[in-house]
Structures are given as structure tokens and as C-alpha cells.
Amino acid sequence: MDQRRLVLFLVFSLSLVMLWNAWLKQSQPAPTAVTATAGVEGAGVPTPTTGVAPGATTAVPGVPGAATASTAPRMVVRTDLMVAEVSAQGGDIVRLELAQHKATADKTKNFVLFDDGTIHLYAAQSGLIGEDLPTHKTTFALPQGEQVLKEGEDRLVVRLEAPEQDGVKVTKVMTFHRGNYLVDVAYEIVNSSERTLSPHAYYQLTRDGKPAESVEAFGVTTFTGPAFYTDAEKFQKVQFEEIAEGKAKFVKKASDGWIAMVQHYFVSAWLPQGGTEREFFAQKVGNDLYSAGVIVPVAAIQPGQSGRVEASLYAGPQEQDKLEDIAPGLDLVVDYGWLTVIAAPLFWVLSWIHGVVGNWGWAIIIVTILIKLMFFPLSAASYKSMAKMRVLGPRMQRLKELYGNDKAKMQQEMMEMYRKEKINPLGGCLPILVQIPVFISLYWVLLGSVEMRQAPWLGWIQDLSAKDPYFILPVIMGVSMLIQMKLNPTPPDPIQAKVMMAMPVIFTFMFLWFPSGLVLYWVVNNILSIAQQWQITRMIESEKSGAKPA
């Protein structure tokens, strides 16, 4: 029994080591500034496989002296949730700050999602495909001054004018909403020429291949890259390496769906209107620069007529209760790793409790109590087994003295003693075995849920997704583990006994770097386990106190 218990502890320790390594990587300093020589303007204009009008071209005409995205004039748009910088080149959103989410390294600054090269290259681009139609490389005329969503207004409409070409006038209309991370992007096309227009619209996300944060656990990296969704194929993630090697597998054509760029905690996604055929693409467009997007057809526009095409851009946090309402399957961008089947309902319960108590730390404590109650019968049986083993300690010591040189005989006598006393030798291992998947699932919930990011509990714990700044919880956890060890029967093998006593020290050291929310769960779980085990041990020892050893 002791050997099996030791093996389980070692397996659990290995799990903790892997989680610890993952958290150390996640906690590394932010990446250094991008040194790429080309910006997002290096992304090309995509080409639809069908439907381009005869004589139309997707080539972008050269514009002498045209400004790049980094040097073109910009317009700042402010809402209650975001600060966006829109470039005159293409009307692209080349920088986006999220006002309700602070930077990891400096909490006095807003988190930057789209970036123009300070740390990353990342932009939302769009345009039209067809002869002389504006693309993301066309210079638009911007409104004068900063555009601000004023008090009492629910939306802010910004109009960008493209140069008229051969009787075709195009206006890019961007609509920002109060309390929403959605931006509606429409193209209004007025055809004053003598030809029929059959254009396509494209919407793409262009970014470098560097992960926003390096996170790895159990061989699974927190995903950074494009993701496609359709009703037919559902959610498909594509690695940047697969795009570079031309091996990316995803749905190419569909009548529904969206394209997203996923990273830790945040996501951007182009959401075309439903019911129209569309083509998806992903390509490498520069040195460590990738573009993924969608192409949709625009209904033919006769001479003297006008047309309009629209898509929505979501750029914000992976708030699970809101994503599924925005678009089908958008909530799948939240990455819980290979234990999603446990982690997803665990987060749902946490979220519901948080809605009642208003604090994620207290929600974790309540969930821990509920989990403990759920496994109470199993834990009780296990602790009874360990308590009986503790009572039988003197008899086991005598067996060791009698048969110490005959391992087989000693094992035989011990098993006979277990049988007579109705003790399950594996009973003490079950609580540890059961908690491993729950422990790992909670780790992924804390790691992958933006709701936990920078969420305070009380006092010194101001971010449940970060380590305890003063290591108070890990020390309490280590002490609680030591108390638990004292309640367990002492292994007859001195080496095993020393290894078991070293576990609290080893675990405490590793837990120093774990998210404080996870340590909080483990501390509360240990305290509840100690109370339950102490009560059961006291009861068993009282029952056996008058019995004579066999």
C-alpha cells in the first residue's frame, strides 16, 4: 500500500512540476519590441477563386509616394471600452487599446490588442476586390479631429471617403457601439460609371507569428493563431507553422462562419453577415507575418445604382457569457486544453457563484467546498482506511521485526491482517487520484479565463491569475500538507517515510509560482480534508482503544 501511495504522490508531483514549468513560462517578461522591417501593409489583397467580373483585376495599382500604415495620417476613436487608431491607409485599425483591461506589466496602462510594432504587428484590414476599387492599401480621407462617443449616445459612426475612380465612389463606414467590442464595418458603393460592378469584399486579420504570452502545460501550448468556424466543420485552429509550410487544413468555402485571430485571454474576429457564400484564406505575407480572412461577394451594381456590404469586427476579451451570443461557436476560442469536459462546467459553476457573491476568490472557496461535499463519501471511506492503518501501526511494526528479512512473508502477513480488519490497502490513494483532474482543470480555468485576469480576492491578493506576491498562501498550503502527513499512517520503510515528509517542502516551493487562485483552492481543500480526516481518525482510534492486538 505504501509503495502505491508513494507512486501516486510521485505522479501528482510530476503533474505539479509540469504545471509549475508552464506557469514560469507564462510569467516570463513581455516579449521585446518587433524588429520586422515591413509592417502590416505588406499583406496582399486576396483573390477569390470565382466570381470576379471579366476584365477586373485584384492587383493593387502602384501609387507613387503612397504612405505606409506606419506613416499615414491616423484618426483616434474613443468609446467607453476602447481607444482605436484608424489609419488613412485602407481605414485599417492599426492600434487598439482596451480601456477596461490593463497591461500585464504596467497596470497603469491599457492592454493593447492591435499593435503597430511596439511589441507586435497586428491589425484588422478590409477592402474591396475589383477594378479600381479601394483596398487596404488605398488612402482614404479621414474626418477631422478625434472621434469620441459622447455621453448619452449609444453609437458613433465614422465615415472614410476613398478617392473616386472612373465614376465609382466608395465610402467606408465604421460604427462603434457603447458597451460593446463590436465594430460594424460597411462599404457603400455608388456606381456612376457605365459598367456593371461585381465586386467582392474581403476582411482579414494580419499579425506576426509571435505568441502574445508563452504558455505551455502538459505539452499543450495556449493557442495563438487563426481559427475558422463553419456549421459544417465547426471550430478549426491553424498553426502559423502550418501556414508557412502550406499545410494548413481548414474549410475553404462555406455559406456561413467566421475567421478569428486567437491569443491568450483575447480574440479578434471578422463576422460576415449570415446566408452568403464566402471563401476563407490564410497565408504568409512577409517575414513572420501572416494574414487570415474571408472573402464575400457583393451583389452586382448596375450603372446609376448603389450597393452595400457589411461585416462586424469583434476585438476584445474572451468573455464566455457574451461570445456565444455574438456569433455561433465564438465561445470555442476559450482554450481549456485537453480537460475541457471538466473545465467548462467548472467555470460555469464558478461564474454562477460569482454572480451571487460578486468576488472570484470567494467563488473559488465555495466551489472547493462543493467539490469536497461531492466527494465526501469517497473521502470518508479513504480516511477511514488510513485511520485504521494508523491504529494498526504497532502491529505492522511487530510484523516488520518478525519478518524483516523475509519480504514475501511480511507482505503475506500484512495482507492477511488487512483482510481480517477489512482494510482496503488502496483506500488512502483515492482522494489524491480523484483530485488530479479537478486540480488540472481548475488550473486551466484560471489560466484561460479572462474573467480571472487581474481579479482581486482580498487584502494582498489583487490578481487571482498571478502568484501570491508575498507567498503567504503557499506557506499556509505547505503547513496544511504537513499536518495531513502527520494524520496519515507512517510508512514502515524509513526511506519512504522521508520522501513523504519531504513532499510538503517540495510542493510549497512549486506552489510559490502558481496562480494564487489555484493555491487558494488547494489551501481550502487541505483545511477541509484535515477537519474531515481528524474527525474520522479520532472516531476510529476511540473505537479501537479498548481492543487487544491480535
Swiss-Prot record:
What subunit structure does UniProt give?
Interacts with the Sec translocase complex via SecD. Specifically interacts with transmembrane segments of nascent integral membrane proteins during membrane integration.
Q: Which Pfam families match?
A: 60KD_IMP, YidC_periplas
Task: Please name the GO terms of the biological process aspect recorded for this protein, alphabetically.
Answer: protein insertion into membrane; protein transport
Q: Which HAMAP family match?
A: YidC_type1
The Swiss-Prot or TrEMBL record annotates one GO molecular function as:
membrane insertase activity
Q: Which terms are listed as keywords in the entry?
A: Cell inner membrane, Cell membrane, Chaperone, Membrane, Protein transport, Transmembrane, Transmembrane helix, Transport
One Gene Ontology CC term in the entry: plasma membrane
Q: How does it sit in the membrane?
A: Multi-pass membrane protein
Where is this chain primarily localised?
membrane
What family does the database annotate? Belongs to the OXA1/ALB3/YidC family. Type 1 subfamily.
Q: Does the keyword Zinc apply?
A: no
Name the UniProt record assigns to this protein: Membrane protein insertase YidC
Question: Sorted alphabetically, which NCBIfam families does this protein's record hold?
Answer: PRK01318.1-3 (NF002352), PRK01318.1-4 (NF002353), yidC_nterm (TIGR03593), yidC_oxa1_cterm (TIGR03592)
Family matches, as InterPro entries = Membr_insert_YidC, Membr_insert_YidC_N, YidC/ALB3/OXA1/COX18, YidC/Oxa/ALB_C, YidC_ALB_C, YidC_periplasmic_sf
Stated role:
Required for the insertion and/or proper folding and/or complex formation of integral membrane proteins into the membrane. Involved in integration of membrane proteins that insert both dependently and independently of the Sec translocase complex, as well as at least some lipoproteins. Aids folding of multispanning membrane proteins.
Please give the start and end residues of each transmembrane region: 6-26, 333-353, 356-376, 430-450, 469-489, 504-524
UniProt subcellular location? Cell inner membrane
